[in-house]
Each structure stands twice: as structure tokens, then as C-alpha cells.
Amino acid sequence: MNYQKLRILSYDSQFNLNEEYEKRFNSYSTIHTGISIFPFLNEQKVTSEKYELFYVPLPSMIEKAEKIKYNSEKLRKLSTSAKLPGIAQTKIFLSTMIDEIQSTNETEGIESTKYEIAEAIVNRETKNKSSKKRFEGIVNMYLNLNEMKFEYIKTKEDLKSIYVSLFDGESDIDEWPDGEFFRAGQVELKSNEKVVHRGVTSESEVNSAVTDLINFMNRKDLPFIEKCITAHYYLEYIHPFYDGNGRLGRFIMSSYLVRKLDPYSGLSISNAVNTNRAKYYKAFTEVSHPRNKGEMTHFILDLMDLIISGQEISLLQLEEAEGKIKHVLNYLDSLDDLTPAAINILFTLIQDNLFSMFTNMDDSDITAEKDISRYKLNPILKDLEEKGYIEKIKLKPSTHVITKKVIDEVAI
């Protein structure tokens, strides 16, 4: 028999809802979170009821957690494999990150383009402080994850600091928090003109709930995946800010999974959520339904499915990248009119073509990547150009790309 939601079982007239709830809640294996919610129904909080969030660690949950860890190990090995050269690794990561930011924006109805996000990456890499780009804050925070610069949440100030770093100066944040740390007023979420959630009411209640959340996040006695997912739900339940809560919550979840698993497991969350938006939002409303009485079991299972889905997409992309590199190496081995140094530079430009989303490496990028002087690079570029392997597309900064002849050879 499937482990059903309490809400679904309650529609059976022979079923005793309270008895089953007590059995689940008081089971020896049940995990109690110590954080509580008021349920939500018919556009209103049910303040006459309050439930502690809990979950039952079913065999299927343990199996999914193991699957996530197994996939993570595969991702870690693939993404750092010698079969994927450094340029390919960097470009694939940036492409994944751009998809992640684009997806988290789309989920919240924020209009953005991948080109805008790529511009913010370039601005950060060139340290251009005179021209601030849209999404610069969120791009910087996601890039920090790849550099192993993590945000730890020990206090309310830490949570507020992450929010400011993500969204400071962004035009799509309509209303900034007006309390000491968080919002002072009330907030509600609507879908098709219907209220689907009301955040924790007053500033003092928000502060108290955030303190409970932080205490929960820093518990050492819980499995980290289940804890991460539960914390994600509770942050969205609190809704401590007027705008940006969804993107904030998904960033924090990404950050935690990057730290505990690997970059690709963490940076595929929003893409999977955006693809399965209905499932994601339905999971939230189920936890909040009065008849489910605060049970998180199915929410955790649903979000584990999304994590696995994102991982599988990343695994496929990395495996395809390995196949492309193998094909390129076979092509390079067939060339008999180039020096090893020229083949090395051509390999660099082919990787740039295969894995860059928008911007090309310029010649100075090549010197930095290959640790070669311009004095030595220029004659190699000239030789490649004369033999029809590359062409110059820009004077300032000097930029070369592979020709159509090479593109046709390496395409698979």
C-alpha cells in the first residue's frame, strides 16, 4: 500500500484522521523539526490550528537520498575529469549557472535574458565597476559558490545580508524591507487573483520565526538533504521579505547543496523547479493544508525528485561534453600541418566555440589561460589564420575564432 497524504486518506468516511496523524507523529522513527505552522485554506490562515512540521523517513526517502549522493559523486568525477579540459569545465559551469539564474527568474515571473546574465558575468570578471549591470548581485553570489565562498546563516543579520547581496539595486524588487531586518507589513501571494499564501504576520513574529528557522538550519542531528528541503519550505512559509523570497530561498538551497554535494547538484535546482513548476507549488500547498497537519514527508519526496531531475540533466550535459571533446581530439590528431603549440591554441579556440554561450575569448584571454606571452602567441595565431583554421573577428580587443571549416569538422 502506498504511503498516502493524510488529506487524501481523510476523504474515506471509514478513516480516522486524528488517529492516523497521532500514529505518524508519534512513531519511533518520525523526525520532529521543532518548527510550527498555521495551516492555510480558502485564502485564509487557520489560526485555530497549529502544527509542528514533521516527516517520516520512508524507505523511498532513504533511497532517493542515496540516489542524490550517488549522482553527486558521478557529477563531481565527470566535471573534474581529465577528459574535460579546464576551458570546457569553466564554460560548462558558466552555462549551467546562466540557466539556473534564468530559471529562478522565470519561476518568479521576472523577465530576463541569458544575454543580460552573461553581461553581468563579464562585468564581474573584468572588474568593471563603472558600469553596473542588471543581475550583478545574483551573478556574483552564484559565482562565489564555484569559488567555494559560502554564506553561513547564524543570525538574522546573515539572512538579511544575503538578501541585500542578491538584490541590491535590482529594479524588479518593488518594495524593500521596512523593518529592522525584514518586512514590517503583511504580505500575501496570489495566483489567478486568488490568495494562495499569507506570510507570517508581524515583524516581531517574522523575527521569531526566522530565529526558529536558523536554529533548525544549524542542527547537527538531521540528514542534510531532508534538513535543506524542510528549511526551504519554512523560509517560504515565513516570507520574510516583500519581494524576492522565492529566489532567495532557491539560492540558499543551491548554496547548501553545492557545499554538501557538488556545484552541479546545487546549480540545477531552479532549472528543475522551473520545468516542474506545478509540482513545486503543489508541494507547498499540500504541506499547508489543514488535513495534512504539518506533515513534510511528501514535500521532501517531491523536492528530492526535482533535485534528481536536475542532476540527471547535468549528467547528460557533461557526458555529451566528454563525447564532443573526444571527437575534437580525434580531429586534432588527424592534422599534420600544425605544430604542437598551434594545435594547443586551436584546441583552446574550439572549446571556446563549443561551450561558450555568448562571448568569445579574446587573444589576451588565451595568453592568460595558456600562460603564453603575446610575443609567442601572435605567430601561432598568424599561422592558424593563414592555414584557414581561424579568423580574426575583432581588432580591439584582438579576437580570433575558428572558421566554418573547423566548425563543420568538430560538429557532432
Model-derived regions: residue spans:
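FIC/Doc superfamily catalytic core
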Residues: 1-412
